Amino acid sequence: MPQLNSGGGDELGANDELIRFKDEGEQEEKSPGEGSAEDLADVKSSLVNESENHSSDSDSEVERRPPPRETFEKPRDYLSEAFRRQQDAAFFKGPPYAGYPFLMIPDLGGITCPMVPSHPASRAYLQMKWPLLDSPSTAGLKDARSPSPAHLSNKVPVVQHPHHMHPLTPLITYSNEHFSPGTPPGHLSPEIDPKTGIPRPPHPSELSPYYPLSPGAVGQIPHRLGWLVPQQGQPMYSIPPGGFRHPYPALAMNASMSSLVSSRFSPHMVPPPHHSLHTSGIPHPAIVSPIVKQEPSSGNISPNLSRKSNVVVKKEEEKKPHIKKPLNAFMLYMKEMRAKVVAECTLKESAAINQILGRRWHSLSREEQAKYYELARKERQLHSQLYPSWSARDNYGKKKKRKREKQSPEMENYTKTKKMCVQHFPSDKSCDSPASSHGSMLDSPATPSAALASPAAPAATHSEQAQPLSLTTKPEARALSHSAAFLASKSPSSSSLSGHLPSPVGASLLSRPIPLTSSILSPPGVFPSALQALPLLQAQPLSLVTRSSD
């Protein structure tokens, strides 16, 4: 506990402390002796002084706030009452602020303890234990609500009424000295400091961090921000502005003190120390949340400017009229003949109409085409006169840019899906599809006549079943050529079929992947079945023949 040597005196407490009279049940707790008569005299003198000093106050306020006593024995009543309330355990609700952990001391004279006798020596010890409250009796009789600067700078701090109190006064601590964590409990025996010879203060863990000054504060749980809104019935100390100020008042209670207080009381009852405001009322810079200044940087401005410039350029380009290139000879011919072709044909597709126009253009003679070439030359001359600075590159570049802007997301998705298809499908068709490995199906089809040659052979391969009918269906000429090949390949020997076949037919047969159970590995006796199936091959498409054979 911080100690302060002030000019001594008889006043040991504030004039707002609570005093219990003998008729309230304290006479039984005190030791019988000489203290009773002295206490009665003290009470009478304090009442006279209070009536003289606070003539403007009402009787209720006088009863609520009796002045302090001026003799050495005056802390006994207060301390006994504090100890009784401590025993009742009705007041330990937690301190409203952590700056006053030493303001309530148990009654040292009222307890029957062998180490603390109830005689004047203990009272002298109590006076030494409260050096901060020592002041002359004449200075303690001044009005508590309007203390003079001299009184505040040198003497005891007096209790102010709540509505006269500055809201930041409870944050000002007594001293910047810290509590010694290793001192044993000092309320049992007075410990004298070997350096100064002054008795040490009691241990912080044995003291209540709250100072009960009025009966209205009994049993009330103070608000966490009660130091900002002073309430009636909860008077607080006004501390002298000079000499006792701590640079960070809420941090005056060190870690050992906070641990001792929290060990005595439950965590939800002891609020954490407030560290929000400085003594001057200005928030500390380390506590205030930093506000980042939003200064515009060059990196943030440049993209916006570039975007704006791009938008302006695009708008200017859009405002310019699109100049078409001059028509060539074929375009002039299409422009002239398109209406005739549409009238002659019932087709409405532009692609088909363009094909017809292209065939007719190539069927024209040179003389007829020369007429349109001459018209195209005149068109170019007129265009160059109208637009001298125009070039075909302008339109070409614009169109390309527009296509990239419009089709960039779609083309990306399209290419992704197309790659997926390329990855999945070739693995199925690369080996068993003749179209992928040996050219188109029209040139070298997988013939189902080989399957007809052997009834036990499968009807068609997997690739043939997967392909549409348009690829597997062949005209009658194809069927006749294949049947002729089989007729020419008829031989009683079973050595090698490709040696007796004609070279193109043998190559076409061997170049296709044929199942192992096909006609090549079958005995030659099954070939008459192929001859019997020739009328069917000539009359029906191949796809229908293969399905009927299944």
UniProtKB/Swiss-Prot annotation:
Its main location: nucleus. Residues 1-76, 182-206, 390-473 are annotated as: Disordered. One of its GO terms (molecular function) is RNA polymerase II cis-regulatory region sequence-specific DNA binding. Residues 323-391 bind DNA. GO terms for cellular component: beta-catenin-TCF complex; chromatin. It comes from the Eukaryota. Residues 1-60 are annotated as: Interaction with CTNNB1-A. PROSITE patterns: HMG_BOX_2. Residues 444-463 have a biased composition (Low complexity). The keyword Protease does not apply. Residues 17-32, 51-76, 406-415 have a biased composition (Basic and acidic residues). The keyword Transcription regulation applies. Keywords: Activator, Developmental protein, DNA-binding, Nucleus, Phosphoprotein, Repressor, Transcription, Transcription regulation, Wnt signaling pathway. CDD domains: HMG-box_TCF7-like. Residues 407-550 are annotated as: Interaction with CTBP-B. Residues 464-473 have a biased composition (Polar residues). Residues 1-11 have a biased composition (Gly residues). It is found in: Nucleus. It holds the Pfam family CTNNB1_binding. SMART domains: HMG. One of its GO terms (biological process) is canonical Wnt signaling pathway. Interacts with csnk1e, ctnnb1-A, ctbp-B, dact1-A and gsk3b. May interact with ase and tle4-A. Participates in the Wnt signaling pathway. Binds to DNA and acts as a repressor in the absence of ctnnb1-A and possibly ctnnb1-B, and as an activator in the presence of these proteins. Required early in development for the establishment of the dorsal body axis in response to maternal Wnt signaling. Belongs to the TCF/LEF family. This is Transcription factor 7-like 1-C. It comes from Xenopus laevis (African clawed frog).
